[in-house]
Amino acid sequence: MKTKLDRIAKDTNLFLDKFVDKQSKSKLIPAMKYGLFSGGKKIRSKILIDVGSLLAIDYKKLIAIGAAVECIHAYSLIHDDLPCMDNDKIRRGKPSTHIKFGESTAVLAGNSLLTMAFEILASPTLKISEKIKIDLIKKLSECSGHLGIAGGQYLDLSYEKKKTSQSKIIEMEIKKTGKLFSFCCAAPAIIKKKNIKEIKFFENIGSDIGLLFQIADDLIDFKG
């Protein structure tokens, strides 16, 4: 398990490193790389590749899609750490991106990683049909925006210091964490041109995995 996870993390980072290096250079690249290569385990990519392997999808295609997912995840962490959000100064044992590079640079680096995710999905590097690319981009957009990560973060902030029902907390955690996991499970089904009901089945599995992941993470934080 760990060996496979290490391989996926290595291959995903290699893809991202090459993709970023092909970009026109800008002053934001160092902050983008700092947030992107911060030592995460690439759990989301692992789940995507496991589901994709069950559906006999080419590993390189899955790595590319997983790289897009990791861009979204990195963007969300950079923004979550900002003073106006969770105000976390440390991320994975290192200064958060806004501490290292400044708040405005962190916002712009996060925005750039968000858009780079869709650039990866639209690029010729990903060898799938244009129709499937559009479907993947649509689904990832939904999981990243007000119906997903951004909406979940909004709810998280609005529930601070308030007594909140269990159902509302679950809704928040599904949006904030579960939606990106749901994309990881649904993407292979989209590539294989499964019907709407089948895709929803995979989405629900991913959402449940994401919810369990977030609950476990919260318990670890609670216990210190």
State the predicted function of each range:
Residues M1-N13:
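N-terminal leader/targeting segments and the immediately adjacent pre-domain N-terminus
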Residues K10, D17-G224:
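Mg2+-dependent prenyl diphosphate-binding active-site environment of isoprenoid biosynthetic enzymes
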